[in-house]
Amino acid sequence: MLAIIGGSGLTQLSSLDVSHQQVVRTPYGEPSGALTFGRIGKQEVVFLARHGYGHTIPPHLVNYRANIWALSRGAGATRIISVASVGGIRADLAPGTLVVPHQIIDYTWGRQMTFHDSLDVPAVH
């Protein structure tokens, strides 16, 4: 099954023929919302809005581990595509311009970076 995580501006998939929604509990807390299951053509898809339905969760509060666990372990997704949009600071790049960044400001510090953060579980490489 294919999982799609929608970022800002993508809180639903218009081409998704929805079959049901499901709330998934995870060992990492609550994901951003209920998972939406359905099909796009012949492809089974599960969708999750990263910032919650209604865009109520700011980026620094998104529970990334719960989202990934819910989609992979909870829903059985074997592939995950995440769609995102970002802001920019260059006036000469209009909205809709596709760029490949070569300098990145990383605001991901201060949050868990792994699913394996316990000394009780041996590291697997």
Regions found by a protein language model. Give the residues of each.
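Metabolite-binding pocket within alpha/beta catalytic cores that recognizes anionic/polar moieties
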Residues: 1-125
